[in-house]
Amino acid sequence: MNVAKCRLSEGELNLINMQVAQGLVPVGVDLAARVFQVCYYDLDKKVVKNFQLTREKFFDFLRNPPFEQKMLVGFEACGACNYCAREIKALGHRYKIMPTKAIKAFLQLAKTDKIDALGIFKGTFTPSINTISARDEQNQTLLNLLGIREQLSKQLVQTGNNQRAMLYELGVVCNEKKTGVDYVIKASEELLEKLKQENSPAYSSVEVGLEALRSNVRNIEAQIKNIEQYLLDYAKNNEDCKNLMSIPGIGALSAVILHAVMGDVNSYPSSRHFAAFAGFAPRVSGSGGKVTVGEIVKTGNRHLKKVLYMCAVARLSQNKKLDHNSSTRISELLGDETTPKKKIICSIANRLARVAWTVVKNKEPFNQDKCRLLSLPTDN
């Protein structure tokens, strides 16, 4: 089958005509770094056009389209989709970001740019495909900052582990229960002092390595502290973060992560959808009218899932410290020996996700009268 001579079915042509009747011409674009593959249906010549444009010429194509109507530009979710969506919207057109898995249903040939663009084009005028909201520039940079913080934290752990391995090779076994980098540096200093007393020839090389370790750790810790200070200041000045921090168990950094990963709250139809996006929806299977609710699924946004789990653990710790009379719903669940503790934590995390969506959607702080599971114990 030749992509250049591709013919659309009558049903596909009807869907395109419906879009055009609404004042939008569907255009499918396969995004890339330097060249974009553009595909659309020419209503005058009755043919599918599928051609390649450079980055500059693509945006010229958006500014001066070959038809009078505005365009509905569809493309797959990728690294460039948010920027392109903002540019398309600024030029007066509409965009449609689609999940990559949804486009696979329209790909019937080998993998080429033209075939991908054709599949994206067909997905653009198909109304049943779910769309993804584009993130604004502030949200993107905030997510990038959180990614840098996580990367620096991993580097700090990696630096400590490398030094532990070096100490082990020199006969120093570190305590497994002491995981901080400061402990590793202290153990290295003790080894250095021992080598100095023994007049060991290895003293100079260990000294240089220890100084490099100290410098690297100080540098990483300073960068992490700088980023966290910015995030704390951001949380204090952002209304959504303030409302999120009013939820028991959610701190400033967790609120910023929730706010950043959530993005546009209107892209989730309900709080249940946001909880499922976070990965705290139970697996459901059913047949013949019998439905079984299983364990928590392993899908979902891993960053959001980790933060909500830690917030749920924090809320559980709050309950142990504050609820001396066992008056809260969490205390009732903990009192049931048949309920596993992690199951309680997952249920709290699920409720945290749903309440977080609600407070951001309604732009109001947490009201513990409306949620018994997360409410703090009252003073008697």
Can you describe what each PLM-predicted range is?
Residues N243-S246, A252-E337, K341:
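Phosphate-backbone recognition surface of nucleic-acid-processing proteins
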Residues N17-A21, K225-P248, L258-V261:
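Extended, structured, electrostatic nucleic-acid-contact surfaces
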Residues R55-L72:
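Short, basic/hydrophobic alpha-helical segments
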Residues K96-I132, E137-Q140, N144, D182, ...:
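Short alpha-helix plus adjacent loop in nuclease-associated cores
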